[in-house]
Amino acid sequence: MINVLLVDDHELVRAGIRRILEDIKGIKVAGELCCGEDAVKWCRTNSANVVLMDMNMPGIGGLEATRKIARTFVDTKVIMLTVHTENPLPAKVMQAGAAGYLSKGAAPQEVVNAIRSVFAGQRYIASDIAQQMALSQIEPEKNESPFASLSERELQIMLMITKGQKVNEISEQLNLSPKTVNSYRYRMFSKLNIHGDVELTHLAIRHGLCNAETLLSQ
């Protein structure tokens, strides 16, 4: 039996995935959570073979939660299931320790195939995303995102900023000092040739790393 943990801050999304999986022989939904912090805590006291993880959630988010789970619970495989498929997110997520990467537009059977593949010790990347990653290696000048220059930590902080989180919130959730968070911010601004959080959010929207509604809600 493959025990699966669903982690997404939208109950409707979790319900849809649960309906897909509950009729699949050999797969069981072992739990449902709405944030990355709770996923890490859950894994300390419960057993999941596979975690289906959303990227953008309140708190530390899917990228940081994936990194923590992959490093601490080596037998638990994480599949990122997200609307964000643009470079450099897939590569950064896989580097953080994810075993798979899927778009939320994936067909139900592909989700099942991904779960079975990572449980068997393989990596699974949706074909369209894998093609995009390959093209970015073959023709980097045409396909590389300006965000590709960011480190994993910088990318995580960027995603939190574009959700409207402030420096103090980010420092508390990532267990960093506000000074350290600001150092990451200014390093990002320098790499991206921008001057503030609003410009950062606009740039992230243009490159498909966050939704336009994010800016409107700030």
Residue ranges of predicted features:
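Active-site residues of response regulator receiver
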Residues: 54, 82
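Receiver (REC) domain active-site loop signature in two-component systems and cognate sites
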Residues: 57
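Short, flexible helix-to-coil linker/hinge segments that flank and couple to helix-turn-helix
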Residues: 88-95, 100-152, 156, 206-212
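Helix-turn-helix DNA-binding segment
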Residues: 144-179
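Basic, Lys/Arg-enriched C-terminal extension of HTH/homeodomain DNA-binding domains
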Residues: 189-218
